Every structure is written in C-alpha cells, then in structure tokens.
Amino acid sequence: MKLFEYESKKILSDYDIPVPKGYILSDISQLKNNMNPLVVKAQVLTGGRYKKGLVKFYDNSLQAREPIIDLLNQTFEGEKIQTILVEEMIKIKNSYYLSFYIDRDLGKILIIFSEEGGVDIENIRKEKISIEYLDPYVGLSNFIYKNITSYKTP
C-alpha cells in the first residue's frame, strides 16, 4: 500500500506525533492566507519530489497562487496532479529517513532508517542506513525500537 504524504501525516497526527500545520487543496479557491512562509507539495506517489520541482517554498500565499495553479494543471509520470499539500514552513533541526516496506516473501515488515534523511536516500552510503525486520504479529519490540532510535552513524 502506498500513501500520499498527507495521508501519512494524518496517521501520525492521530497518534499525537507532531506534524507541521497544513491542509490539502484540489482547487485554487481553497488556498488560505493564514500561513507565511509556506511549503507547497504536489501529492504524487513517487519519491524525489523536491528534485522534480514538485515541492516549492514561498514567502506567502499570494506568491504561491500561480505555481499551485500550474501544479494542478500538470501530469506527472502519467498521473494528473489532483491534490496539493500546503504546510507551514518550519525550521528543520534534523532530517531523518524512515520507511516501512512489506516483504511479502518473508511475511515481515522491513524498517529502513537513516539519520541522513532528506532528498537522496538512494545515494546514502550503506553503512549510514539501519535495516531491521519487524514481525507484524510481534509488533515493534523494544530491541528494534532501541536499535533504530539509537542508531549512530560511524
């Protein structure tokens, strides 16, 4: 199952995990003037959106208006962009990469974590990435949780 970023953030928020304030829109008439500065993120099921010009930063909503219209009129990798996530811009102290992938052959969930998050997880050296398997019937054990959260790069 693939989730859009806004769907993932809704799940995190439901479990009281802080996420930036934001909202989704599918039409420019839904653009609000309550966030300055802001981040505009096209919601497509692909990685590398920033490098592909699908994540942009603006000082105010007026500045973001035309680019949002352009994004909503784009097709990306054969799929029309239908939804935009608009979020408050926050100062980033640290950036991490965390991914959960279902390994159907093993019947387990693969957790991939790196303290070098951000744009190019594919280009991070292997020794900077922590990989653990999670048995869905056991859950996130303390061992795995400690391994991932205390992971330090060499």
Name each model-derived stretch:
Residues 20-22, 40-67, 97, 119-126:
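Glycine-rich phosphate-binding loop of ATP-grasp-fold ATP-dependent ligases
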Residues 4-11, 63-67, 140-144:
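General structural feature for long, well-ordered alpha-helical segments within catalytic domains
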Residues 141-154:
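A long amphipathic alpha-helix within ATP-dependent nucleotide-binding catalytic cores
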Residues 78-136:
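Hydrophobic alpha-helical hairpins/lids featuring a short glycine-rich hinge
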Residues 26, 57-60, 88, 100-102:
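Short beta-strand-to-loop capping motifs
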Residues 1-37, 42, 150:
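A conserved helix-loop-beta module that forms one wall/lid of the active-site cleft
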Residues 15, 64-66, 70-77:
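Catalytic core of tubulin tyrosine ligase-like
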Residues 6-12, 35-50, 77-92, 98:
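ATP-grasp fold ATP-binding core
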